[in-house]
Amino acid sequence: IDIFEKLELEDDDVLDTYLNAMFEKLQIDSQLAQASQGDLASQESITSQEDIASQLKEEIKLTRKDSTSLNDIFDKEIEKFEEEEFWRVKAEFEGFTAQLLNYKGKKAELKNESETDELLNSLNEEFYVQNVEAKNRNRETKAPFTTSSLQQEASIKLNFSSRKTMLVAQKLYEGIDLESETVGLITYMRTDSYRLSNIFMAPAKKYIEKTFGKEYVGSLKQAKKGPNVQDAHESVRPTSIDNTPVKVKKYLSKDEFSLYSLIYNRTLACLMKPAIISTTSVELKNNDALFRSQAQALIFDGYLKVYGKYESLELSVLPELVKDTNIKPLNVEKTQHFTKPPARFTEARLIKEMEDLGIGRPSTYSQTITTLKNRKYVSITEKRFIPSDQGRLTVDKLEEFFSKIISVDYTARMEKVLDDI
């Protein structure tokens, strides 16, 4: 401990080194072995059923976590969905458009064209400006990357599969040849922690102040710690703030550069001030109908200075409107729409679902998705999972014989019990 204090290190900064040294003398833990055996038993209860395999015309090679995830993808609500008609009304004015918000004191829900025409016929030629309000709000930065959030963000922003993300991250972690030496550019990429070490944060904040100004220096928000978080390693971050993406770009492949830039900028952003956005809202009354229009402007870019290219922000301006005055629209328009079924899972959403429900661990998310793809239980259409015929049949049979074992609740409780052991 005295050595830690002299070096200004925290215990967690040297935890990995300590554990690696201790591992050489580690004896087999009987409780861990029992946990592994218990997990294996629940897997084999699924994979060893010959009668089911014969009905499916193939051997079942799914773990309990794979089966639960496949069952999650095969959403019965989507299969039985029936679309419903609805209508929208908008009023176009000089320089802005307002959408119908309320009708007769209730949220506007126009089910058919006759109801819509009734509303349109009740409108006067002019709209009354009932309220004009402007408010500033903070747009907070997100937490540094865990394994799960890295896979999700890389899927959304870079179009990487979870497997590709982990392979590229592994390479960045193991080391890149930078001229005369091999350097690991990121910390360990299998983690569920939002922590950043003080050893990293101090120089990172100095870099932010020097590069962007003191007004951009923020602090790491304390993210809520979930019940299943083990917190063994700190979050995924660059090993050195000095290794900027521009500096190391010539040593990296295209994919390595894209992922490293994402990790570097996300880590930097989480130590910066929030962005400040001004939102102006206008409410327009016309008899029993209330319309609203909103616009937002960027007051202070904050963390968006480095992370803005990864986040969409629609900026617009409303003309000067005076409360308690009347304005005439250029046009009032009705449009027909139909409800859509719940969206099928993307890789990013499935990973988030597994994390939220406690299905598996960060190290298993990618393998679960890869298994479902390789076994052709699902296909990918427009970045979304579509269950194959074999996948549907497999889910039906698993639900018939193993409805309890593949349930989300059972799988999450099993993970918790095994962690406790």
Functional labels for PLM-detected ranges:
Residues 1-39, 44, 48-421:
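Core catalytic DNA strand-manipulation module of type IA topoisomerases
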